[in-house]
Structure formats: C-alpha cells, structure tokens
Regions:
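Bacterial N-terminal signal peptides
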Residues: 8-16
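Boundary at the C-terminal end of the N-terminal hydrophobic targeting segment
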Residues: 18-23
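Beta-rich accessory regions
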Residues: 26-51, 56-67, 90-108, 129, ...
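Surface loop/turn signatures of beta-propeller and other carbohydrate-active proteins
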Residues: 29-33, 69-88, 117-154, 173-176, ...
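Hydrophobic core segments of beta-strands in well-ordered, beta-rich domains
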Residues: 50, 100-102, 152-172, 194-198, ...
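Beta-propeller domains
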Residues: 64, 144, 160, 165-195
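Beta-propeller blade signature
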Residues: 182-186, 241-248, 295-300, 354-365, ...
Length: 612
C-alpha cells in the first residue's frame, strides 16, 4: 500500500527546480507589501505546487476565482527552506482567472526581505504530482494518507464489498489545518486505495469528524441507498452539517439547508445509526467541554430531536469528550446483548494525552443507562492501554454482524512533532469488538485483530512448540525482508519465574521491552529506548495493561511495523498500541525470565506481506 504513483513528477526534484516566478513559468508573483503578495496563475497545469517549510509559520492564501473569493487555505509557505510541496488542484477552475491573495506572517522589514523567502522561487505549475513514498517510517500494512496530515477516522461504512475509510486530512501540509475528509477504500482491510478528497471546507468552516450511513430506504429524500454524511462544520462556532452521495461515497453534495443543527457551546463529531426496534435514526453528539454525550433521534436524518444526555460526572472527566460511537454486542454464553458507548477524551488518558474510554449498558432508543459495579458505581474502562490509539470508531453496515473499528495511531501530545514529513500519522490495525466477563463480574470490551489480517502471513521464520527460558536471553532473528516487519505469536507460562521479558531490538542497541509480571497480573511496554524519542518529552514512556484472564498463562499476538508495535493479549482482552521510530529496523526478538525458569509455547514469527 501507499506505493501507488497516480502521477509522475518527483516532488523532491521540484524542490531543486527553483522555478522562476515569471510569465514563462505560468505563474506571476506580485509583492504588494512586506506581508502581502499575489500569485497569478497565467499558464496551464493541473496543479499549483506550493513549497512548504514544515516548522514555518502559517500563511493565509485566499483563492480568488474571477476576482471573487472562492475559499481560504492555510499553508506554511517556506521561508528558509523547502521541505516538500503540496498540490492545489486547479481542475475545477479551468476556464477561470485564478489568483491567490497571500498574507504571510509578520517579521519582514521590507518588501526586498519578503521577496527572499524560499517559497517564491519554488512555486510551480505541473500536470503531475508524485505520491510515491519517501519516508522510512511509513508503515507497510497500516493505512496512511498519501501525503499531508491525518487525525481522526470518520464516516466509515461498508457497501458492496468495499470498506470506505474517511479521515481528518490536511491536503496542504503535514500539520493540523485545512481539515477535509480524506478518503481511502479497501476490499480486504489491508491494502488501501487513495481516493479523491471527499468533503472540503466551505463557508461554514472546516470539516471536522462525523459519520456516514447507507440510507437504504431513502428516508432523507435523496434516493434509496444514498450515502448520508453528517459532520461538524467548525469555524468560530461548531454546527452540524449534512452531505449526500449517490455514487457510493466518491463525491458528496452539500445540503443547501446546512447547518441542520446548532448549539450554543462546542458540540461535535455526530455519530448516527438506524435503531431498528424504534424505527428511527439515532445520533450521538459530543458535548465536548461539558463532558457528556447528547442523544438525538430523527425520522429523516435532517430534523433531530434531543432525547437525553449521558456522562455528567461519569468516567474520566479530565479532557474534552469527542468522537462517540454506540453499538450493540452479544454477551458470550447468554442470549443477551449489551450496548457499548465509546468516548474518546483528550487529555486524560491513563498514560497521558488522548485515549478511548468506554461504557457498557442498555439503550432503549432514547436513553443510555450504564452498567454499575458491585458498589453501584460506573467504572472507568479503557479500550487500549498504549499511548497511540485515539478516536476509535466503527464501520457502519459491516458484514456478518461484525463490529469492526479502527483508530488514529498517535497522541495529541506529540502527533505534530513525529519525525516524518511527507505524511503524519497512521491508523491502527482494524479490530473486531467483543464482550467478555472479568473476574469481578463486570463486562469488558475486547479488541482483536480483524480476521483479514491472517492473509498477510507467510511461512514462519521461527516455529518452536516449547522451550524453557531463564536469565540468559534466547534470541531469534526477525524476517530479513521488509525491515523485520512481522507478526509474533506465543504463549507464556511464567512457571517459577516472577517476570518474563520480550525484547525487540536492532543493531543500534535500540529496543522495546514487553514485560509480563506474573504476580501483578500485568503486561508492560517500555519504549524509552526504542529509537528517536527526543522530539517530545511526552513520547518516552512505559505503559502497563491489566490482564483479565484467570490463569497464569498469557497468549500474545504482536504486530511489528516500521513505526508501530501493537500487542494483543488473550484474544484482545488486553491491548497496547504504541508508535516507535527506530533509527534502523528491528532485527531480533529476545526472551528471558527473572526469578526462575519460564516456559514458552507455540512461538511463531511470521513475515508479513500485505499484497497477495
């Protein structure tokens, strides 16, 4: 994935091109003042390529079409050096006069100084834009944007064999801004095809998170099987908007009656679904600063009635509440079902920054009633005990009754500083939600890798049915191909030991250590020496997850990609997702124990191949 080149000219070559801004280049630049310039497009070319300095200050580009303002872009135009280019697609404006009124940051003393900014000699027209990968940390089998910033997944639905993944995207830089709905599709949840931008900012503001449903009965009035999107329009205030698609989510029409819902305080990330027992649509809306979820109902996806609110004083109240989801799951061993409400918060996660908490309970179509513990309290439960799984939401209309989710694999504490340039952030692996009972009688949510991922496995390079380990580490080579990318599976019986350690490392003495503490019944993940860690004080960390199974033996599945490790214990009952940035690929797995011998069973190391 992400090796697809849809267009041809290398971006790096453009950085060296230093094309003169003249009539011959098809671009004319007029410097009107120390922080104001005009870019006039006079030639032909599909893209206007803008040079970006990733750490630079933001410039405002007002796009004028035949002299009238069409939209505004925020771009970190290069002042000192060009890190990369981003494309403005001029195709929709063909036949019109296109001008950009550019407001650059203050700090230039004269027009002469302003004209020396690196951007002005590197702006160019081109018929092509290259998205081939230039990043050593781009994952092999995780979804990433071809270029630009990405955060929350949103609007996900399944239709006619295709998984649609939309996401918060900045197509004009690798830091947060210009939020649109990027779009990718897959038939196997592994290999993702980049699609054109789906929904872009308009006069109501940026396009924040939301959800999509397939309106099979045509209740919204846009025809049967239309895809309906609800999203937050974010400007000075946050309002809710609707768009619809009649081509299976490739392009969307903006509803002229937007906004369809307004509130006096921050409310965002509408998540909707059809509630069959009451024959109505249900929407959850995050009342962000009030730490609650608002529950609305509608007959037609346009007119919404507030029915109840949930969350006041419950769960973690430390940060804003965002990105809700609500779905029903069967309770194993019974004929009952329970509802699960996902609530993403930032900050307030168990190890700092952003994280996903959840509640189990009952839902009658209007009100969510949470389960309580033996003391009558509503416990705080976490979906993932790593640092890097946020904004987890599910696909609507997933096949075979599945509840399949995906998250943003980063953390708001340091996402903008991660050591990549062409793109920032990946998604987690897709996961299947399930319920299980803990020793305390409470219901908990499991999160296991989606079954499609098994297709990536090649013949294992290591396969050991049983071995004993002690203080002296036993070391195994990771697959030589694909930078050591692999899936590791094993069962750990601590036997007489107190701790069992798994260390994944490289020749630069960088490593991640996973430790199973048999007495505490916990598993921890130490990435303090994992590679590049100094880009943020919040990145070096040890995360710890409780184990929920009663026995002493723990089963692990560990997915190692170029910049992440995802650990699933006991079929996803305990999960940790953490990003890593080793200076060279990991090459070895070492196993050891302290306090006595431990037993390892069913160790396998699988090379992973996404495309088959």
């Amino acid at each position: 994935m992400n090796k697809l080149t849809i267009l041809a000219a290398p971006m790096l070559a453009l950085s060296a091109l230093a094309a003169s801004a003249s009539a011959d280049s098809g671009v004319v630049i007029d410097h009107l003042g120390v922080n104001n310039s005009l870019i006039r497009v006079t030639g032909d070319g599909r893209y206007l390529l803008l040079p970006v300095e990733d750490s630079g200050d933001e410039s405002r580009l007002n796009l004028l079409l035949d002299g009238k303002q069409e939209r505004t872009l925020t771009v970190r135009l290069a002042k000192n050096k060009v890190d990369y280019h981003v494309p403005v697609d001029l195709t929709p404006y063909k036949g019109h006069t296109v001008t950009f009124n550019v407001i650059t940051p203050q700090g230039r003393s004269s027009i002469r100084e302003a004209k020396e900014d690196a951007c002005w000699t590197s702006i160019a027209l081109s018929d092509t834009f290259d998205i081939s990968n230039r990043e050593k940390y781009r994952p092999l089998f995780h979804h990433t944007p071809s270029y630009g910033w990405m955060n929350d997944p949103n609007g996900m639905f399944y239709k006619d064999g295709v998984w649609h993944l939309y996401y918060q995207h900045n197509p004009y830089g690798s830091k947060w801004q210009n939020l649109s709905w990027g779009h990718s599709t897959s038939t196997d949840l592994i290999n993702w095809k980049p699609e054109p931008e789906a929904i872009e900012p308009n006069g109501l503001g940026l396009v924040f998170s939301g959800s999509c449903v397939v309106d099979s009965a045509g209740t919204a009035g846009f025809g049967k099987n239309a895809v309906i999107a609800l999203y937050t329009s974010a400007d000075v205030s946050q309002t809710q908007s609707l768009a619809w698609s009649t081509d299976d989510g490739t392009t969307f029409n903006i509803y002229p009656g937007n906004p369809i819902l307004t509130m006096e305080s921050e409310a965002r990330d509408p998540n909707m679904f059809w509630h069959a027992p009451t024959q109505q649509w249900v929407m959850l809306l995050a009342h962000a600063l009030d730490h609650e979820m608002l529950i609305f109902t509608s007959p037609d996806l346009k007119d919404w009635t507030l029915q109840s609110n949930f969350g006041k004083g419950l769960g973690c109240q430390d940060g804003v509440w965002e990105c809700p989801d609500l779905f029903e799951l069967p309770v194993p061993g019974t004929d009952k079902k329970k509802w699960v409400l996902l609530c993403n918060i930032n900050p307030g996660g168990p190890f700092g920054g952003s994280a996903t908490q959840y509640f189990t309970g009952d839902f009658d179509g209007k009100t969510f009633t949470p389960d309580t513990d033996a003391e009558g309290k509503v416990p705080t439960k976490w979906l993932d005990y790593g640092k890097d799984n946020y904004a987890t939401v599910s696909w609507s209309d997933a096949p075979d009754g599945r509840r399949t989710v995906i998250g943003w694999m980063s953390n708001w504490q340091y996402a903008a500083e991660a050591p990549t340039l062409q793109y920032r952030s990946a998604n987690t692996l897709p996961r299947e939600m399930g319920l299980f009972s803990g020793a305390d009688g409470q219901l908990y949510l499991s999160s296991a890798p989606s079954p499609e991922l098994l297709a990536m496995r090649a013949k294992p390079v290591t396969s050991a049915s049983h071995m004993s380990i002690g203080n002296k580490p036993r070391t195994f080579a990771l697959p030589a191909a694909n930078d050591g990318i692999c899936e590791i599976t094993l069962d750990i019986d601590p036997a007489k030991s107190s701790e069992v350690a798994l260390t994944i490392g490289n020749k630069a003495n960088e490593s991640v250590t996973v430790t199973y503490d048999a007495a505490a019944r916990t598993i921890s993940f130490d990435r303090r020496n994992s590679g590049l860690t100094d880009f943020s004080k919040d990145f070096p960390a040890v995360t710890t997850a409780p184990l929920f199974t009663a026995g002493r033996t723990v089963s692990l599945r560990i997915y190692v990609d170029r910049s992440s490790i995802e650990l699933f214990a006991d079929d996803g009952r305990s999960v940790m997702t953490n990003t890593i940035f080793p200076t060279s690929p990991y090459t070895t797995l070492s196993l050891s124990s302290t306090g006595g011998k431990a037993e390892i069973r069913n160790l396998k190391i699988y090379p992973l191949t996404p495309s088959k």
